[in-house]
Every structure is written in C-alpha cells, then in structure tokens.
C-alpha cells in the first residue's frame, strides 16, 4: 500500500545528535517567513507548543507524544485553525513525524505529516510550506547553525498566506 501522507527525505553530513538538536529547536527553523510565533516547550515528552503565522491565518497546537533521542520525534496536532481553509481544523488529529537514521557517513531525516494527504484542501499549500521550512530553514540550521530567513513571503508557490499572489 502506497504512503499518501506528505513526506520529505533529507540527507545531511551532520550527526544524528546535531540533527535531533536542530529539530527540537523549533523556533530556529519553523520561522522567518510569515511573522511566526511559537510558544511553549518543544523538546521534552508531553511538551505542548503553539504555532501562529500570517497574522492569524495559521494557528496550531502540538503535543510531543513520542521522543527517541537522536532517532525520532512525533508531534500530535491537538488544535488547529487554518483560516484560509473551508475546514479550518483540518490539521487537528494529524501527526508530524521526524525519523532520523544513519546512512553510511550521512544522516537521513524522514519527515512525514501523517494525515496531510492529497484529498484535503490544505495539501498543496501546506506541503509547499513544509518543503520551504524543511529544505531551506531546517537544513540551514543543521548545516550552518542558523535557520533561513526569507526575504520574500511569496517564495512559496501557490500559497494563500498574506503576501502571496493567490491572496491578492
């Protein structure tokens, strides 16, 4: 059976420990594009944190439900309000999963947003946003110690967040 959840695989030259530390430092990589604000704990089992972006366009609350140091982290989305969607709570009940493994002398990060599937309204915009945060900001944090700070909000093709062409 084919996995239809949104998934991104990244390979880096850093150790699993450095990768895990970067992932837990959510404020440093899930930011820089839409006036994001993150409050709460992002490192320990049962920590809860909120993510707000786009001046009220996106709100979600995540709970860390599984942590295997240097190998895996799972967030359960317990609340969501994505104001650019008809079904604003589309993320509620979904899981955001980071799996870390050694691949020779490199480290692989397998990111899966379980429940973010092509049939839901958010799929295109949310998968584009995840790709941007992961492939630019998280990778930059892992490789250079600093999350990416975008200069243009409309860098996410097709995004409905403020400043994008679909919203204007």
Indicate residue ranges for each PLM-predicted region:
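Aromatic-glycine hotspot motif
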Residues: 2-16, 65, 90, 101-107, ...
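Short beta-edge strand/loop motif at the mouth of beta-sheet-based domains
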Residues: 7-8, 18, 25-61
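Solvent-exposed residues in well-ordered beta-strands and their adjoining turns
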Residues: 11-15, 52, 78, 101-103, ...
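Hydrophobic pocket/interface hotspot
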Residues: 19-23, 49, 64, 75, ...
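Hydrophobic-ligand binding "helix-grip"
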Residues: 31, 40, 57-104, 114
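A conserved amphipathic terminal alpha-helix motif
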Residues: 115-168
């Amino acid at each position: 059976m084919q996995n239809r959840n949104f998934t991104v695989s990244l390979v880096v030259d850093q150790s699993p420990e450095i990768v895990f530390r970067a992932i837990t430092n959510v404020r440093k990589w899930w930011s820089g594009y839409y006036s994001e604000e993150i409050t709460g704990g992002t490192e320990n089992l049962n920590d809860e944190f909120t993510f707000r972006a786009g001046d009220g366009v996106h709100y979600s609350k995540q709970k860390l439900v599984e942590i295997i140091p240097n190998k895996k982290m799972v967030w359960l989305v317990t609340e969501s309000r994505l104001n650019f969607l008809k079904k604003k709570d589309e993320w509620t009940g979904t899981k955001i999963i980071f799996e870390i493994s050694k691949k020779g002398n490199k480290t692989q990060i397998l990111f899966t947003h379980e429940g973010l599937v092509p049939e839901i309204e958010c799929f295109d915009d949310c998968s584009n946003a995840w790709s941007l945060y992961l492939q630019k900001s998280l990778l930059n944090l892992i490789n250079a110690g600093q999350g990416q700070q975008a200069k243009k909000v409309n860098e996410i093709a097709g995004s409905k967040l403020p400043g994008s062409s679909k919203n204007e």
